Amino acid sequence: TDSQFITDDMEDTARQVISIVCRQLPLFSGVSITPDIARVTDNSKVTDHHAILPTVQLEKQDVSALPQSEQKILNLIGMRLLCATGEKHTYAETQITLSCEGYEFKTKGKTVVQNGWKAIEELFKSSLKTKEKDDPMKSLPEVHEGDMLDSVSASVTEHFTTPPKQYTED
């Protein structure tokens, strides 16, 4: 299914499943969240089938007895459910404009205020053997208006971009 929502009548089941995921899946055993089910509940956006969820039968299963590939799929589905209903990821974004010799230079940086659902996603990514390359969040040094920067080195570099390769049947 491509649906990312559940129906209103599934709210209690979703809460129960989230609790089971946090208890049964070793990867999420230390995770404690207060789920916001309302973010994934919308009858009008459910197409022919609701979003994929683990069932309450997970509670009766020995997850360690599952093949590794099935455990990975279950962890992925559990992670998506916890992220979708977890706390918001909030950050403060700062923009700095510097002027030098009549030229203006701008940069942006972010500071995480509350990691929220990103903590669950990072936990999942750290469990994978091949880690995805993620854009590291740029943190900026403490600067104030009017500060003078001495001995700043700079260089000019030339880079070329290429479009992503098109999908083929090969």
Which residues are covered by each model-predicted region?
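Core catalytic DNA strand-manipulation module of type IA topoisomerases
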Residues: 1-170
